[in-house]
């Protein structure tokens, strides 16, 4: 296994079978020790959040599979906080899919004129954005 990329919340490794291993970390985006899902830097560590994020990812990949939608997901190991995926060629720096259940972080910075911080987003709000390296 060879480290090929270190991200804010995951490290990416190449595997001998040409697949890719994602190692979910307990690091969170935020600022000055305060969690903020819209921040572009690591601001704190929360023990167990890597595994929680992996469990959430598995859930959504399984829903996609059940709906007959193909993905790059191969398998996961919750104890090790790892996910094996097929290699993929990304557009630019990749696409980010964000599911928000509460209005906070960058969502409030963009839409705070219309909604209060902490407001539950009934049914969730999903947005797709291009990743930037800013």
Regions found by a protein language model. Name each.
Residues 1-133:
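Active-site loop/lid in soluble adenylation, ligation, and acyl-transfer enzymes
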């Amino acid at each position: 296994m060879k480290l090929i990329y270190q991200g804010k919340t995951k490290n990416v490794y190449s595997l001998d079978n040409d697949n890719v291993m994602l190692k979910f970390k307990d690091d969170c985006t935020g600022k000055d020790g305060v969690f903020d899902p819209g921040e572009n830097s690591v601001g704190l560590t929360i023990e167990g959040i890597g595994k929680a994020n992996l469990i959430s990812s598995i859930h959504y990949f399984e829903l996609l599979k059940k709906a007959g939608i193909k993905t790059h997901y191969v398998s996961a190991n919750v104890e090790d906080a790892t996910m094996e995926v097929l290699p993929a060629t990304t557009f630019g720096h990749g696409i980010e899919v964000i599911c928000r259940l509460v209005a906070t972080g960058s969502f409030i910075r963009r839409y705070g004129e219309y909604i209060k911080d902490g407001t539950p987003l009934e049914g969730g709000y999903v947005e797709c954005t291009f990743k930037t390296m800013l």
